[in-house]
Amino acid sequence: MSSARNYRYIVRIAGTDIDGSLKTVYGLAEIKGVGVNLAYGICRRLGIDPEMRIGYLTDEEIKRIEDLLSNPSAYDIPSWMLNRRKDYVTGKDMHLIGAELIFYVKQDIEREKKIKSWRGIRHALGLKVRGQRTRTTGRLGLTVGVRKKRR
């Protein structure tokens, strides 16, 4: 391990502040759009120890991580690890992180609503989209209590 003077309590990667005491894999998973599996893949590709605390990463290692996140295909990250394969508009495999991911998801939901697909209708009505039951769960509004019958 590096000396204590190289330790950072907060590390900023891809616009996200990460607690320096987390292991590298779990620290990277704090970034929206990066899960634990992709974080292990990043560590393996860049030769970073996944068990090392993220606060001990050098500036050069952080720069390489950010470069990989912005262009994963250049580092031979397999397409099944990316979170937006065969994009609706471009047809390319992409990996989105942070605010860009949130924007694209909202755009997808709006497109579903516009074409009035089943999923879009469910989103528009505020109901569950993925086939879950709705009879008893997911109820909104105030609860109506049951009163005991008076004699």
Swiss-Prot record:
UniProt KW rRNA-binding keyword: yes
Key words, A-Z: Ribonucleoprotein, Ribosomal protein, RNA-binding, rRNA-binding
A molecular function (GO) term: rRNA binding
SUPFAM superfamilies in the cross-refs: S13-like H2TH domain (SSF46946)
GO BP field: translation
Signal peptide: none
HAMAP family attached to this UniProt entry: Ribosomal_uS13
Family affiliation: Belongs to the universal ribosomal protein uS13 family.
Subunit structure: Part of the 30S ribosomal subunit. Forms a loose heterodimer with protein S19. Forms two bridges to the 50S subunit in the 70S ribosome.
Protein's UniProt name: Small ribosomal subunit protein uS13
Protein source organism: Staphylothermus marinus (strain ATCC 43588 / DSM 3639 / JCM 9404 / F1)
Gene (name only): rps13
